[in-house]
Amino acid sequence: MRAPASPDLVGTPERVATLWRENLLSGYGQTAAEALGEPLADTSGALVTLTGIPFHGMCPHHLLPYHGRVHLAYEPAGRIVGLGRLERLVACLSRRLVLQEALTGALVSALMDCLEARGAACAIDAEHLCLVLQGREPRGARLNTRAAAGSLVGRADVLPPVSA
């Protein structure tokens, strides 16, 4: 198969390489600890939740994107981070070749390990283009994953229900 000769394709390989390097796989450029930054002292112990974080990831099986929303919760044990840092954590760990199931667990592990949290939970709701483009039924299907650790195991009330 030969590529069509078109002026629209001039520079396309470079644009695609830049897109993959600077956006789709940019998460490899830092660690979870770097994304979270230096934690702040906290004495309140109040449950922290951040919901509806938009994200995209890349399916390692098909090299096609998936996208949706991440919901995070953690119970601090004296260390917190700003909410923007939680968004950076999601970007860091999702902008890689990673299965959604693994991403869900990695986000929980990062909160537990980097913040030494008492507990952490994550729910992800996403649409996968590998399903959409292959024409599999049912149309509009979404993958929902959940993980929890520590004091938040079994606490379904800390995160919103995933889309139906």
Stretch-by-stretch model annotation:
Residues 1-164:
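A domain-level signal for the structural core that forms small-molecule/cofactor-binding pockets
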